[in-house]
């Protein structure tokens, strides 16, 4: 016993305890460091498993008057409004744009919109930009990134406050398929070299379209895709995925969530860079193996979004062809629609 009546072994234990803690901390750190290294590939890049998920910032909004949400009244009972992985599917009636506008304005958000106006497709650019000024991200800061081989043909369109246009000169290709596929390469390159320093989100659209109704911050998320208007009612077996195993875009017939349109996708600059870089690398590998995916960059986009689930999915309101599909009652609004054209004349 010591002078305070405690057993000597008890005092000994108290003396050893700090040493044991130090040993455990040291070896625990080494173990965790080893595990962290296991999540990195041989090239030193962090594996997808360690990437940050879509964490929406919590911002303080001002007092606002708006209808109270009712937990017993579905916002839409005629369509799916959430994916199985709990990503929202954006339809008219599923969001309050006033609340969202306040949230994104308080974050001082800047949105980039990329569009490719190559060869004869430059004729669609004026209508694209004019309608974007009317309907796209109204009230927010926007940078239009126009990729073109004809910079002198880019029209002068009056832009609102906080909005500007940047012309990026790129080469053209003989085949329209190559023009389409090289979009991924260009977006990937400029995301790394420029976009990440200038904008918070990227939206990638087709130039032979026009905005016909509101397209705003409700679409913004870490990674979003848009349901293809021709397949939103179809079963996965009917999707026009790439079905040849030789291609990097191959998807088996028993897999698939949705069929996404190649003409409208986006997200944070980081996630768009990951997507476009992966698709470009897959297309390069296909080319080396003498195969071209059935729907080119769209096929690779669908493969990517199958295994990298988007954090938000846009309904076909955001890509529509009224001439081919009419205006079904389920579509409360048609927001981004195809412009009638002669594909053969434009592509050749």
Swiss-Prot record:
Tongue, esophagus, large intestine, stomach, caecum, pancreas, uterus, seminal vesicle, submaxillary gland, parotid gland, thyroid gland, parathyroid gland, salivary gland and thymus (at protein level). Esophagus, large intestine, stomach, kidney, urinary bladder, uterus and thymus. Changing residue 300 to Y: In allele A2 and allele A3. It is an enzyme of class 2 (transferase). GO terms for cellular component: extracellular region; Golgi apparatus; Golgi cisterna membrane; vesicle. The active site is at 298 (nucleophile). It catalyses: an alpha-L-fucosyl-(1->2)-beta-D-galactosyl derivative + UDP-N-acetyl-alpha-D-galactosamine = an N-acetyl-alpha-D-galactosaminyl-(1->3)-[alpha-L-fucosyl-(1->2)]-beta-D-galactosyl derivative + UDP + H(+); an alpha-L-fucosyl-(1->2)-beta-D-galactosyl derivative + UDP-alpha-D-galactose = an alpha-D-galactosyl-(1->3)-[alpha-L-fucosyl-(1->2)]-beta-D-galactosyl derivative + UDP + H(+). One of its GO terms (biological process) is protein glycosylation. The keyword Transmembrane helix applies. Induction: During a Nippostrongylus brasiliensis parasite infection. The expression is a transient event, with a maximum at day 6 of the 13-day-long infection. Residues 33-348 are lumenal. The chain crosses the membrane at residues 12-32. Glycans are attached at residue 108. The conserved DXD motif is involved in cofactor binding. The manganese ion interacts with the beta-phosphate group of UDP and may also have a role in catalysis. This is Histo-blood group ABO system transferase 1.
